[in-house]
UniProtKB/Swiss-Prot annotation:
Residues noted as binding ATP in the record, renumbered to the chain: 17-24
Location within or outside the cell: Cytoplasm
Gene Ontology cellular component list: cytosol
Top EC group: transferase
Keywords annotated in UniProt: ATP-binding, Cytoplasm, Kinase, Nucleotide-binding, Transferase
UniProt xrefs under NCBIfam families: guanyl_kin
Family to which the UniProt record says this protein belongs: Belongs to the guanylate kinase family.
Molecular-function GO terms, alphabetical: ATP binding; guanylate kinase activity
Domain Guanylate kinase-like, residue spans: 10-188
Catalytically driven reaction(s): GMP + ATP = GDP + ADP
Superkingdom of origin: Bacteria
Protein name stated in the entry: Guanylate kinase
Organism this protein belongs to: Synechocystis sp. (strain ATCC 27184 / PCC 6803 / Kazusa)
Pfam families the UniProt entry points to: Guanylate_kin (PF00625)
Length: 191
């Protein structure tokens, strides 16, 4: 870190919402527009999907490793979702914010609630599907989950959708370009 950046403070942006709502696609598009922003890589105990790379897509951990990270306070937040653990490694986020960067977290709803306690200044944005039917189509379109997993994710989504009003902003991902435009406006083109 350069000496003149020690007093600069970045911002933490949390994107959350049900599985299949399009958080990952929106984050990818945001980073294409703002490549200087930093995407925090989450840790998880779930198995990698096709094309996912350890240390790039997620940090893939065993449940024992994840429990160790919790005990050593290496996570800003963590939650269990659909039988797996997810969490945000603390160190890279704190380093990037200290350097004045905008840090994006793409995390589950339970974790996003914890962030309000850890980082009260974080802007928490809930991404909504246009309807539950569209959400189900998106989950099935992935082709990576069993019927049981899809049913669990849809049941979880119903609960999460009821929590949308708890968050600072809500963005409906009906039209990708419009949702992206709204996010850029909420976050700010430049810090």
């Amino acid at each position: 870190m350069a000496p003149d950046q020690t007093s600069v403070k970045g911002q933490l942006i949390v994107l959350t919402g049900p599985s299949g709502v399009g958080k990952g696609t929106l984050v990818q598009l945001l980073l294409e527009r703002q490549p200087h922003w930093f995407l925090s890589i989450s840790a998880t105990t779930r198995s990698p999907r096709a094309g996912e790379v350890d240390g790039q897509s997620y940090y893939f951990l065993t449940k024992e490793e994840f429990q160790t990270w919790i005990g050593e306070e290496k996570l800003l937040e963590w939650a269990e979702y659909a039988g797996n653990y997810y969490g945000t490694p603390r160190q890279p986020v704190e380093e990037q914010i200290a350097q004045g960067k905008t840090v994006l977290l793409e995390i589950e709803v339970l974790g996003a609630r914890q962030i309000k306690q850890t980082f009260p200044s974080a802007r928490r944005i809930f991404i909504l599907p246009p309807s539950v039917e569209v959400l189900e189509e998106r989950l099935r379109g992935r082709g990576s989950d069993s019927e049981t997993a899809i049913a669990k994710r849809l049941a979880q989504a119903q609960q999460e959708l009821q929590a949308a009003a708890e968050f600072d902003y809500q963005v409906v991902n009906d039209d990708l370009d419009q949702a992206l435009h709204r996010l850029v406006k909420l976050i700010g083109e430049e810090e």
